[in-house]
Structure formats: structure tokens, C-alpha cells
Amino acid sequence: MATFKPLIADSLCVAYGKADVLNSVHVEINPGEITCLLGSNGAGKTTFIRALTGLTKPHAGTIQFDGLEITGLPPHRIVSMGISCIPEGRRVFPAMNVEENLLMGAYQERDRNRIRERLARVYDLFPRLKERRT
């Protein structure tokens, strides 16, 4: 099995115009960990996710994933590495069931066995999703 390195945001700073939203944020997420961002409206949760996924460019700091510098990469490159986010509140694919939504995350993966393994892992981590898959 491959050994993966953490996702690290180090000294991350993001601003919209003159308004600083993230100021020297440091987050390290190790393989296998589940991490939750909590905060009030305007705390920077969405901005942080947008920076991780390449949708918003930080003006300082770095983002590394699996030992590679990904700061400033275009979103499609970051998605191809396995990092993405779908905002639940937007109901992006409302007609799809849970499993169909999860399989959307594997649209670039061609190895059917790998897709099945990843889906099984998600269901092991989140049994409620398995109960509601169809």
C-alpha cells in the first residue's frame, strides 16, 4: 500500500481586496484523518476550502499535498490529485442518490477495482451513507 504524506497549509494568507480573511493559517491533515472546519459566518471556512482546491489564490503561504507543492495550481490539476469539494447546501446533483454522488468523485479514475475499494472504504468510515446509498 502506498504511503501518503499529509495535506499541509502553512502560513496561509488570503484576502479579498483589502479585507484579510485568512491570516497565517496552519493546518495539517494526516492520511486517514477526518477533519472538520467549524466557525461562524465570515470566519473563513469557505475561503480556506477555496484556497485548497485552487479556486482562490493565497497571497502568502503554501499548500502541500502528498509532499508536492500545490499552491496556485489550477483547480483541474488539484482535482486530478484527489482533492475536491462539493457544497452540500447547493444541492448540486439533487436527482442523484448517495452512491451516484460519491461515484461522481471518481470520474477521472478508470480502474473499476480501485473505485470499488474506495467506495467500500467510504462506506466503512460512514456507515450511514451505505444505509442511504440508493
Which ranges hold each PLM region?
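Conserved ABC transporter NBD signature motif
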Residues: 61-68, 81, 114-119
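Helix-to-loop junction immediately C-terminal to a conserved catalytic motif
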Residues: 53
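The feature captures the beta-strand-to-loop junction immediately N-terminal to the Walker
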Residues: 38-40
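ABC-type ATPase nucleotide-binding domains, specifically the catalytic core motifs of the NBD
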Residues: 17, 35, 73, 98-117, ...
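Short beta-strand immediately N-terminal to the Walker A/P-loop
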Residues: 35-36, 85
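Conserved structural motif at the start of ABC-family nucleotide-binding domains
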Residues: 7-9, 22
